Structure formats: C-alpha cells, structure tokens
C-alpha cells in the first residue's frame, strides 16, 4: 500500500512525538516533493513526499536500529516495498547496506543531513529564515566540523556524488527546496 500524506503522517506520529523529529520529517517531505517536481517526476511528487515523511520513522524509538526497525514496522503496516527500500536506503553505509538506486533515493540520501545543517545555519541568522540564506553562508558553516556536528558531511558529499552534482549545486538546490517548503520556516 502507498499511503496518502495524511495516512503517512498518522503512522509517523505513532512512533514519534518530539516536535523536532516531526518538523524534520515535514521538512524532508516538502524538500522531496520539490525535487520530484524539479527533476521531472511531477506525477510521483506525493510518493516522494511520503518517503520523506517516513524516512526516520524508527529513529525516535529505536535510534540504535535506525533504518532497520522501520523496515519491520512498514512491512507490518502493509506499506509498499518501494517505500521500505527507499527509506532504508538513506542509512546506506551507516546502518544498512541498502544502496540508493532510484533518483528519489539518492535525493533523500543527499538532502536528509543537509536539511538539518541548512536549518541550523538559518536559526543562527537574525531572520531565522532560509528566505535570505545564501550558499556562501552555508558553506562557511559547513567547513566547521563542530557546527551541526550531527549532520554528516561525508554523507552529504557522497549524496552529491551519487546525483552527479557538485556540492555547491546540491546546497543551492536544497536551499531553494527549503524556501518552497512551509515546514522549513524557523521564524514562527
């Protein structure tokens, strides 16, 4: 089964209660839908959004089994195997050996950590917004390994490489995606 966004959101809330995790899921969902449209997958935008929404389904309850436990949960809920594979693949090289294959999986892999880093940069700005955020501001913070240390630069760079994009292109496109995502508002 491929759930609607509302059904996916309900499943997400069964396993996640922390506002930070819920906001992150909504941001990644919006970013995924944006990239679906930008990359010519308009007809799959809702599917990409569902994958983004559910990608960290197990993280709050089972952080040590991240991308492993969610496969069990999703299969038990009857979710389509494409969702199971896509969400698990964002843990490639970290917790699972499921490699991102489809463009959608590569986008998720590349942008998951990056949205966190961009969000952290935005929160440091007086505007607390991605609307006036520039590539150079993100790159400056990106170079500081202590800034948003939980956001793996290695994963971000590997994701850009998987997509055949430069790091600058990935960051710039993700900033644009976050500007188009209502959940990526930090100034409210």
Where are the predicted features?
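Acidic/His-rich, divalent-metal-binding segments that scaffold phosphate/diphosphate chemistry
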Residues: 1-62
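Electropositive phosphate-/nucleotide-binding environments in soluble metabolic enzymes
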Residues: 2-6, 22-26, 64, 101, ...
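Charged/polar positions on well-ordered alpha helices
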Residues: 27-34, 38, 72, 76, ...
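Divalent metal-dependent catalytic cores for phosphoryl transfer on phosphate-bearing substrates
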Residues: 41-147
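C-terminal binding/interaction regions
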Residues: 137, 143-172, 176, 185-188
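Internal active-site segments that recognize and position negatively charged phosphoryl groups
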Residues: 182
């Amino acid at each position: 089964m491929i759930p609607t966004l509302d059904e996916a959101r309900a499943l997400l809330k069964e396993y996640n209660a922390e506002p930070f995790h819920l906001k992150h899921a909504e941001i990644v969902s919006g970013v995924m839908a944006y990239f679906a449209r930008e990359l010519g997958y308009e007809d799959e935008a809702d599917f990409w959004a569902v994958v983004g929404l559910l990608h960290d389904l197990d993280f709050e309850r089972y952080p040590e089994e991240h991308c492993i436990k969610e496969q069990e949960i999703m299969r038990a809920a009857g979710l389509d195997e494409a969702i199971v594979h896509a969400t698990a693949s964002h843990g490639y090289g970290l917790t699972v050996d499921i490699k991102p294959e489809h463009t959608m999986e590569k986008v998720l892999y590349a942008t998951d950590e990056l949205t966190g880093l961009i969000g952290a940069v935005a929160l440091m700005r007086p505007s607390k917004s991605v609307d006036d955020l520039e590539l150079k501001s993100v790159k400056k913070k990106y170079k500081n390994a202590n800034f948003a240390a939980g956001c793996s630069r290695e994963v971000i760079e590997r994701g850009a490489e998987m997509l055949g994009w430069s790091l600058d292109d990935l960051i710039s496109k993700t900033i644009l995606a976050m500007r188009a995502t209502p959940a990526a508002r930090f100034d409210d």
